[in-house]
């Protein structure tokens, strides 16, 4: 009798201990939201419950919201026909920051990579089939290592221009693809939109463009052209020559609304169209997301001497209204720029303007200019020394997304 009571007592005690040690599932979710993306990818296979939960919209949106509060810097560089991805946190002080290698993807030229959109990127992948080289958009997530190739770009032409965007209404990633005319001017033709919808096969549709234009490359590298575009609140903006509107030497801005599949153009104002030359080379000007608005960064060059930065901010797209801000930089600017070719990277959420060298060296760094304080801060980047002399591209505000490619079922 005593033995039975003892066994029963031990059994009840064990059950009570199990109850006290069991963690509420809501608390488990809170813990998971703070784990790296790759850990989330592994935990999807723990059970069907975890799989459905971690793939659910509530969890993925919550994870992205947390990631938005701590965005990272993304670096890409080409080596041995592979594009390698590194990331690092934003600097908190003057201390060097380490760039951690994620992985590589078969993107033939990193200059063809669109800027990250909610953690995803779009680059161009080349493959040879039956003796013919085919160029296809490749969508990838550097955080999870997942990628997918859009093999149904309907064209026989090699020159495909692709831009990645996100439709905030339908909450789908979309890719705008267009080809270049082979005869005469390189006008955009065969406009297509690919929709990447969760749980479904990617869909494609041809769309009409009533604006005769051609996107303007901002750089040429090893036979490839780099086209610069930025997606803000579901609208893609890129530089282009609009026939009948633009001067053939100086581009306007064309915008594409992913929600309505409509093209529009935005006229530039006097000062946008300056031919920018310095030390015998052309300086870059780029479109950026400046505090939620479209903006354009370009060097300020009175008398062909670089003295600062000019920031154009789009205040009203319908009225084609821009505001201009000129920042005269402190003396260290000229010394740094003359020694190393710097490129505009973008702007931080605080409004700082960021530049960097376009080639990795033993002292690769980011230059932060604070317009309010008129100060320059240089932060060294470590971890990419084995890629010295290779070209690098830097992206700000990279987010980590836990959505995985397989749910798109190619």
UniProtKB/Swiss-Prot annotation:
Stretches assigned to the F-box domain: 17-66
SMART domains (UniProt xref): FBOX
Extent of the signal sequence: none
InterPro entries named among the record's database cross-references: F-box-assoc_dom_typ3, F-box-assoc_interact_dom, F-box-like_dom_sf, F-box_dom
PANTHER family from the UniProt entry: BNAA05G37150D PROTEIN-RELATED, F-BOX ASSOCIATED UBIQUITINATION EFFECTOR FAMILY PROTEIN-RELATED
Name the UniProt record assigns to this protein: F-box protein At3g61340
Originating species: Arabidopsis thaliana
Organism lineage string: Eukaryota, Viridiplantae, Streptophyta, Embryophyta, Tracheophyta
